[in-house]
């Protein structure tokens, strides 16, 4: 294997946060630095973002000994042979990306570590105006929003046609949970692709959601929310992306979809009893974005997935499309709340998200 920087120049061991058991983790000082595969880059981590999935995975499907974490940003220190040949990335590049954290099939790869081994085509090269702190929130939200909209929902139009000048198609798309990191990324992608995004959030986040491109935002606390959406969309809403996937949001989406029916896609399993209410007119599904790494997903129950080359290829295409937008200055970063404290701060952040999920911001920790 050829690489721009040999593994011999790098440490054999690192500090990382690894799973111990359900809800339990530890800061390990001698975790292995991941081996550099031909299609990977090795990144010296500067910042990490903490996601609800980090908590859920640790609490309900832990892989003892595996490194935790999905979202990271930092500087490339080594490239695998395929990444070298591609020529897009180089040692010293500032990047943000996403890895499958706490994977029992690849336990030495996770974001909460000094060095992250990431697939080269699932990292974004950062322009100078985006800081490593802000960039830490890009990876998982990008992967999830793109997959939900353009793969699972199969919205008309191709990823490689994303631009800032696509004529409006006139198709409304509802984003429930518009102030989440996935929600704001979905809204921006929809707007860029020529759709008309509308969203739900709490009133305190209305301006945030509009900043990302939602043409109308509705208060999900309002009992008349679904009726207001139906009125705004002329009872013709065909598509709904549910970034929350709780019973209340599923019910709201179903009530907002137009008289002719349409498509409901959720980021988590949803209440089937609600879906039965319009089974003949609304096609409903949910997805597990972890398939974009092209490996078997060994999680419990309905979260398990077989390896999918198709999803692996889609993940690469979606990041290439977003990279093009990023290069042209058409990507806005989600608000963050910055924590200090290094790896101890990350552990504290996981506990904080477990007790109080963030609203309108992503929790980011500086680790270097």
Curated annotation (Swiss-Prot):
Source species, domain of life: Eukaryota
Under catalytic activity, the entry for this protein gives: malate + 6 malonyl-CoA + acetyl-CoA + 2 AH2 + 2 S-adenosyl-L-methionine + 5 NADPH + 9 H(+) = trihazone A + 2 A + 2 S-adenosyl-L-homocysteine + 6 CO2 + 5 NADP(+) + 7 CoA + 6 H2O
- Subunit details for this protein? Monomer.
SUPFAM superfamilies to which the protein is assigned, alphabetical: GroES-like (SSF50129), NAD(P)-binding Rossmann-fold domains (SSF51735)
One of its Pfam families is: ADH_zinc_N
Please state what class of enzyme this protein is: oxidoreductase
Keywords from the UniProt entry:
NADP, Nucleotide-binding, Oxidoreductase
Quote the gene name from the UniProt entry.
thnE
Q: Which residues bind substrate?
A: 140-147, 289-293
One GO term in the molecular function aspect is:
oxidoreductase activity, acting on NAD(P)H
Establish whether keyword Ribonucleoprotein is in the entry. Answer: no
Identify this protein by name: Trans-enoyl reductase thnE
Provide the function of this protein: Trans-enoyl reductase; part of the gene cluster that produces the tetronate natural products trihazones. The PKS-NRPS synthetase thnA with the help of the trans-enoyl reductase thnE are responsible for the synthesis of the carboxylmethyl containing trihazone A. The PKS portion of thnA synthesizes beta-keto-triene chain from one acetyl-CoA and 6 equivalents of malonyl-CoA, in collaboration with thnE, which selectively reduces the enoyl intermediate during the first and fourth iteration of the PKS.
Q: In which pathway does it act?
A: Secondary metabolite biosynthesis
Reported EC number(s) for this entry are 1.-.-.-
UniProt: NADP(+) binding residues: 53-56, 179-182, 202-205, 220, 267-268, 358-359
Q: Which family does it belong to?
A: Belongs to the zinc-containing alcohol dehydrogenase family.
């Amino acid at each position: 294997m050829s690489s721009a920087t040999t593994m011999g120049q790098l440490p054999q061991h690192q500090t990382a946060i690894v799973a111990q058991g359900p809800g339990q983790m530890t800061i390990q000082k001698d975790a292995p630095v991941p081996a550099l595969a031909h299609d990977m880059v090795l990144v010296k981590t500067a910042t990490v973002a903490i996601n609800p999935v980090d908590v859920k995975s640790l609490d309900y499907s832990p892989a003892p000994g595996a490194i935790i974490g999905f979202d990271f940003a930092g500087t490339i220190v080594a490239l695998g042979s395929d990444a070298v040949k591609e020529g897009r990335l180089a040692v010293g590049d500032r990047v943000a990306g996403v890895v499958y954290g706490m994977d029992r099939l690849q336990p030495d790869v996770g974001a909460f570590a000094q060095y992250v081994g990431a697939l080269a085509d699932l990292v974004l090269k950062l322009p100078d105006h985006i800081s490593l702190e802000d960039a830490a929130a890009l990876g998982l939200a990008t992967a999830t929003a793109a997959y939900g909209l353009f793969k699972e929902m199969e919205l008309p139009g191709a990823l490689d046609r994303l631009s800032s000048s696509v004529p409006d198609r006139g198709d409304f798309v509802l984003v429930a949970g518009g102030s989440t990191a996935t929600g704001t990324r979905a809204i921006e992608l929809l707007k860029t692709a020529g759709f008309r995004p509308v969203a739900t959030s709490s009133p305190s986040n209305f301006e945030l959601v509009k900043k990302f491109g939602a043409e109308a935002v509705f208060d999900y606390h309002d009992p008349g929310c679904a009726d207001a959406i139906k009125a705004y969309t002329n009872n013709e809403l065909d598509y709904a992306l549910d970034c929350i996937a709780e019973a209340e949001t599923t019910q709201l989406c179903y009530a907002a979809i137009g008289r002719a029916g349409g498509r409901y896609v959720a980021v988590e399993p949803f209440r089937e009893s609600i879906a039965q209410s319009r089974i003949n007119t609304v096609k409903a599904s949910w997805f597990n974005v972890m398939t974009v790494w092209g490996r078997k997903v060994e999680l419990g129950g309905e979260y398990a997935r077989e390896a999918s080359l198709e999803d692996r290829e889609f993940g690469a295409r979606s990041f290439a499309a977003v990279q093009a937008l990023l290069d042209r200055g058409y990507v806005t970063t989600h608000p963050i709340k910055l924590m200090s404290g290094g790896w101890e701060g990350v552990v504290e952040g996981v506990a904080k998200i477990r007790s109080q999920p963030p609203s309108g911001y992503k929790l980011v920790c500086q680790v270097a």
